[in-house]
């Protein structure tokens, strides 16, 4: 696993790509030894950067829940990600497409939290108690890095 400095550098690279609306070279091409654990560490650092800029963590999503999607992504289990306040759009509202680089629509599960989850050892009951509600999510993912 990479060190925290490397995770921070990668998160900053993705953050800059998002801000400049420019697709960059795939992270895995520059870091072929990157692991799933590294990817989640980069995600945590990216979320930290966004919160420092004033965004709010509102929930989490679970993706790749079907075996077919896992197989197509060469991943053997569902993945998860953060949902920030500016990622929510009300039914019928316009989504500003100019904020995306290469948008794709994905169907995922969203856990909207009533209170934060803490620590790496959260139990099923911790998640249940922190969850305000669970919804089916049409998630607009964006590719800051080329695949």
Write out the residue ranges for each language-model feature.
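Extended, compositionally biased flexible segments
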Residues: 2-122
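Single conserved hydrophobic/aromatic residue that forms the stacking wall/gate
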Residues: 139-147
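Internal alpha/beta scaffold segment
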Residues: 122-138
């Amino acid at each position: 696993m990479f060190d925290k400095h490397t995770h921070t550098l990668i998160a900053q690279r993705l953050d800059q790509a998002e801000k400049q609306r420019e697709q960059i070279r795939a992270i895995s091409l520059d870091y072929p030894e990157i692991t799933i654990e590294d990817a989640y560490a980069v995600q945590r650092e990216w979320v930290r950067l966004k919160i420092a800029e004033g965004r709010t963590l509102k929930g989490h999503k679970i993706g790749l829940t079907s075996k077919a999607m896992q197989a197509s992504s060469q991943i053997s289990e569902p993945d998860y990600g953060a949902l920030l306040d500016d990622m929510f759009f009300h039914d019928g509202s316009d989504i500003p497409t100019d904020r995306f680089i290469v948008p794709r629509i994905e169907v995922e599960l969203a856990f909207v939290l009533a209170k934060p989850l803490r620590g790496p050892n959260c139990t099923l009951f911790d998640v249940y108690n922190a969850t305000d509600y669970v919804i089916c999510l049409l998630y607009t993912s964006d590719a800051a890095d080329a695949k």
